[in-house]
């Protein structure tokens, strides 16, 4: 049965209408779309249309019966509603293509949409908030907070203080948080919930999934009960959660992970940060710029896995802003007494009003019962996959942070898309040889390809050049010359194989380096390209030119 509905103004309206319709006797399930102004219902014979319109009218909207869509669309909808969401204890496809189960709703969305595009029917299972980590408690809110902190920093201090009077910004964290969360909600509705609501080939179950065997899942529904989902193919894309180190006293204290830090409506006067992960450094600087006195406890140096110059540059920038960076320092004990954290280290005690623990993320796989499906994981719980995202059980796939792939949302989405292609009969692999990475500190850190040490480890002879930003016109015009651009080439061929950059806009230049490496360009070919003058990406051209000339002796825009 189908209804046209007028008067709805948002996705929440559609949710209320759905709830009301599903309370009408005889209604098995309802799919309500605010953008389309429609409802699609699976009902028992004899269900009263008048009861349906009355239920909608009771919410202040108007509903009128509508013509059914095409036979194929109707069959797909009823197959979903009656077969997967009906009163039975089995959920499965209706025979019109493969039935794919997707566990997760963050980057897993890319896989679900690609599977539908390939002709499959999808059951998507999410135990938490639709959208996963990135949009809800990761990339999006953190970058909003970082941007707000950057604005606060520039008001307090900038290279133009001689002509623009500096001022101490008044920080209202509660208002910043409201602005941040409003954008998060907007993106979640637009890019996840709304898309799912409007796709009749995707059924969403809210609950926690575990494998019964290699062909079915048991889903403990959030609103009670359990449902069995049978599948032809399955994708595990459950992401990762903050890892907490086994420091005595830590678990008994009210510490923050990044999740709590991003939704805090207060700025602590003193913040201690355990860890030197990307998340630790981004949030440490953001809180410092919003008013906290920040101390970072780093087990080694910052960015110790990268070219040493990167860690040195960021450490210098942090210390210049008053952030304490304690290298080779670990907490052996954490106590929380009278509202104060006390961290015991080999160099004495550190006291703080709040403690952020950001030592990395662990795969969300412990509750999946992977062994029941014969799916192998490594010692850290990460699912082992091949280049086609297949697990040790070939018709079960995995992608993203729950695997041993690099923990970036764009890697997870790309892996999920390729998994969907493969599970529907295609052949796609994920090539990470030119994978960009960006850290949103200030200055930013961006890398792609080999560092010199990595190349030497793989037996590649290299040559390299490092261009400091005082040779880049954009940086000079900005009066901000912190950082450098380093190019690594294969000796002999001159082919570009790696780029490392520390610069305020490093993230905006790295994709050009990705394309150069992907297309096997030589450093001379890169130097010969036209780059817009007074852009930061022009620094790539200048760095390439340093292999054959002294750029200090060139005019500003020398070709």
From Swiss-Prot:
The EC category is oxidoreductase
Per its UniProt record, what CDD domains does this chain match? Answer: HMA
Q: Which PROSITE patterns match?
A: HMA_1, HMA_2, PYRIDINE_REDOX_1
Cofactor(s) recorded in Swiss-Prot or TrEMBL: FAD
Q: Which residues bind a metal cation?
A: 10, 13
Q: Name one GO molecular function term.
A: oxidoreductase activity, acting on a sulfur group of donors, NAD(P) as acceptor
Record text on cofactor binding: Binds 1 FAD per subunit.
**Does the keyword NADP feature in the UniProt annotation?**
yes
Q: What is this protein called?
A: Mercuric reductase
Q: What is the lineage of its organism?
A: Bacteria, Pseudomonadati, Pseudomonadota, Betaproteobacteria, Burkholderiales
Q: List the disulfide bonds.
A: 134-139
> What EC number(s) does this enzyme carry?
1.16.1.1
**Family the entry assigns:** Belongs to the class-I pyridine nucleotide-disulfide oxidoreductase family.
NCBIfam families, alphabetically? MerA, PRK13748.1
User: What is the organism field in this record?
Assistant: Alcaligenes sp
Q: Where does the chain bind Hg(2+)?
A: 556-557
Known catalytic reactions: Hg + NADP(+) + H(+) = Hg(2+) + NADPH
Described function: Resistance to Hg(2+) in bacteria appears to be governed by a specialized system which includes mercuric reductase. MerA protein is responsible for volatilizing mercury as Hg(0).
The record's listing under InterPro entries reads: FAD/NAD-bd_sf, FAD/NAD-binding_dom, FAD/NAD-linked_Rdtase_dimer_sf, Heavy-metal-associated_CS, HMA_dom, HMA_dom_sf, Mercury_reductase_MerA, Pyr_nuc-diS_OxRdtase
Q: What else is known?
A: The active site is a redox-active disulfide bond.
**How does the annotation summarize its subunit structure?**
Homodimer.
Write out the residues that bind FAD.
108, 128, 133, 143, 209, 401, 409
Q: Which GO terms describe its biological process?
A: detoxification of mercury ion
Q: Which UniProt keywords apply?
A: Disulfide bond, FAD, Flavoprotein, Mercuric resistance, Mercury, Metal-binding, NADP, Oxidoreductase, Plasmid, Redox-active center
* Residue span, HMA domain: 1-64
Keyword Ligase carried by entry: no
Q: Say which domain of life the source belongs to.
A: Bacteria
